[in-house]
Every structure is written in structure tokens, then in C-alpha cells.
A protein has these predicted regions:
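C-terminal interaction appendages of subunits in large macromolecular complexes
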Residues: 1-12, 63
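Helix-turn-helix-type domain boundary/helix-start signal
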Residues: 4-6, 38, 73
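N-terminal cofactor/phosphate-binding cores enriched in small/glycine residues
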Residues: 8-43
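Acidic, Mg2+-coordinating catalytic module of metal-dependent nucleases/exonucleases
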Residues: 13, 48-51
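Duplex nucleic acid-engaging cores and interfaces of nucleic-acid transaction enzymes
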Residues: 28, 44-47, 54, 58-68, ...
Length: 308
């Protein structure tokens, strides 16, 4: 797998990992074990180590996920096969999301009130008299018909948020259309003077350069800028409606409302957090690359400056 990612033959990767496992440092391997690694340089060895560490982290995460789902009695052979087959951390977490232990959510509170059957009826979008059907759920902690419908919508919203196809669709919208927006925190204008270029900034995320991302994130961490990443909300809602809303009746109107709530309250913030982390990683990687190149040039320059 590492060989495919880095384009380095498996034999060289195995030898490198063996040396790292014995405690050899990257500079030592690069300089004194060229015959074992096939002449890999420090950057290549570092990349091998980094990818190996990531895969080890994913393997440990899989063990935790499999154990948790198994304890719930919900681990089927098909689910176990899917989890074992994926090495994409985002996909892994999407698979796990419906089984992930949650603090008491609005959906869980609604389930405890006995409203999951109503949510299932609404999702089918076939019930001709939803109001009358909802009235049959008014008992115990369910105060009235609207309370029943609201609880059912909360359950549907959570289902939409946990749907892998929906999450990937919104990720795709973020990838293609998301804009990063920065605004100065009110009252911080003077303190944030060096970030003036970003006081009212908006640009396509995929076109935003690494040095801009780095500056924006630095200012955000200093409490000087408010930063958000957002796609075209209407396009996202239309995409979700195509997946979940069928027909034009009382049930479909309720599902449409639940889908909009899922996007605004759950899905969008979750995917925005993912893309914020990715943009920070991109900026950090570029900063390290620039620093490394500058240091290399410095070390290669004559000790007393250029000869005249």
C-alpha cells in the first residue's frame, strides 16, 4: 500500500521499515544504509515513516471500532469486511458513525419517547393523514402532535447526517464549490493590523494559496479573525432533497424540513471541520517545505558568502 502511494518499490520500503524498527534514525539510514534502501534520501524515508505511522494509527482505530460495534451486538460479517477493507480514515469514520456511542442527542431523546416508528412512517412518505397518525403517538412525555412530529424530524435528521452517500455528496460540494471566508473580530482591528488583507476576505478554497491559508489560520488562532468554510448551501440542500424527499405530501414536507435541519445543524458543521483540518494540514505542509528548502539553500551556501 505504501509502495502504491509513494511510487517506491516494496523491497526498498520493507528494508527501510526494518531499519527504522531497529531504532536507526532517518539521517543514519540515508547516509550509511544506502545499499539496504536502494539509495533513498531523507525526504523519501520520512515519507515512508509517516505513511507507515498513519496506517498503524488506522489499524488501531479499526480494532477499537470493531470491538465497540461487537460489544453492541451489531457486528455482521459484511460490516466487519467493509471495515477491514478500508484504509481511508474519513470513510472508516463514516462507516462507524451510526454505531458510535453518543451523548444524549435530540434524536436519542425522541427515540426514548417512542417516536422512531413515526420517523420510519414519515421516511416512507406514503401516509395519507400524517397529522392523525402523529396524534396516536401523543402519550407519556410527548405533549402534542407537533412535539411528536418534531421528535420524528430529529430522528430523521440524525439518519441523514449518518448516511454515507449524503456525507460524500456534501463533501463533493465542498471540494468543488467551497469558499473560505475571513472577517476581523470586532474591536480587534488595530491589534490585527498585519492581517489587514484578510479583514473581509473570501476566496475559493481550492484556489486559496498555502501562504494565505497559513496567515488566515494563524490570525484565527490568535483570536483576530473569524474564519468559515462554506459551499453553496442551496446546491447542497437540493442534492439532499433529491436523495431523501419523494413526492409532495405532508410526510415529504416533514422530511424536507428534517433534511434542512440535518444539513444546517449536523452535516455542514461536521464536513466544515474536516475541510478546515485539511486546509490547515496543507498550509503546514507547505510551510515545512519552504522552511526545508530555505534551510537547504543556507547549508549549501559558502560559509563566507559568494567569492568575488
Amino acid at each position: 500500500m505504501i509502495s502504491g502511494l509513494l511510487g517506491i518499490p516494496e523491497r526498498q520500503i520493507s528494508s527501510t521499515l526494518h531499519l527504522l524498527g531497529e531504532g536507526a534514525t532517518i539521517p543514519f539510514i540515508s547516509r550509511y544504509r544506502k545499499e539496504a534502501t536502494g539509495g533513498l534520501n531523507e525526504v523519501q524515508i520520512e515519507n515512508i515513516k509517516e505513511q507507515h505511522d498513519k496506517l498503524c494509527d488506522i489499524a488501531r482505530r479499526k480494532e477499537t471500532i470493531l470491538s465497540t460495534i461487537n460489544e453492541q451486538g451489531k457486528l455482521t460479517p459484511e460490516l466487519e469486511k467493509r471495515i477491514n477493507a478500508t484504509w481511508n480514515p474519513t470513510e472508516l469514520e463514516d462507516i462507524y458513525l451510526p454505531y458510535k456511542p453518543k451523548r444524549k442527542t435530540r434524536a436519542e431523546a425522541a427515540r426514548q419517547k417512542g417516536l422512531e416508528p413515526l420517523a420510519m412512517i414519515m421516511m416512507l412518505q406514503r401516509e395519507p393523514n400524517l397529522t392523525a397518525k402523529a396524534a396516536t403517538f401523543v402519550k407519556g412525555d410527548v405533549k402534542d402532535t407537533e412535539d411528536a412530529l418534531k421528535g420524528a424530524r430529529d430522528i430523521i435528521a440524525e439518519q441523514v447526517n449518518e448516511n454515507e452517500c449524503a456525507r460524500n455528496a456534501i463533501r463533493n460540494q465542498f471540494t468543488r464549490q467551497a469558499e473560505i471566508t475571513a472577517k476581523v473580530v470586532k474591536g480587534k482591528e488595530e491589534e490585527a493590523a498585519k492581517y489587514r488583507d484578510y479583514f473581509d476576505f473570501s476566496e475559493s478554497l481550492k484556489r486559496c494559496t498555502s501562504h494565505r491559508l497559513l496567515a488566515i489560520r494563524r490570525a484565527e488562532s490568535e483570536g483576530l479573525l473569524k474564519v468559515s468554510i462554506s459551499p453553496d448551501d442551496e446546491a447542497c440542500l437540493e442534492r439532499l432533497d433529491r436523495q431523501f424527499v419523494h413526492g409532495n405530501n405532508e410526510c415529504s414536507h416533514q422530511v424536507k424540513e428534517a433534511t434542512a435541519d440535518a444539513y444546517k445543524r449536523l452535516l455542514k458543521p461536521s464536513i466544515e471541520t474536516e475541510f478546515a483540518a485539511q486546509s490547515k494540514e496543507k498550509a503546514d505542509d507547505e510551510a515545512i517545505r519552504v522552511f526545508t528548502e530555505n534551510l537547504r539553500q543556507l547549508l549549501l551556501s559558502p560559509p563566507l558568502g559568494q567569492k568575488r
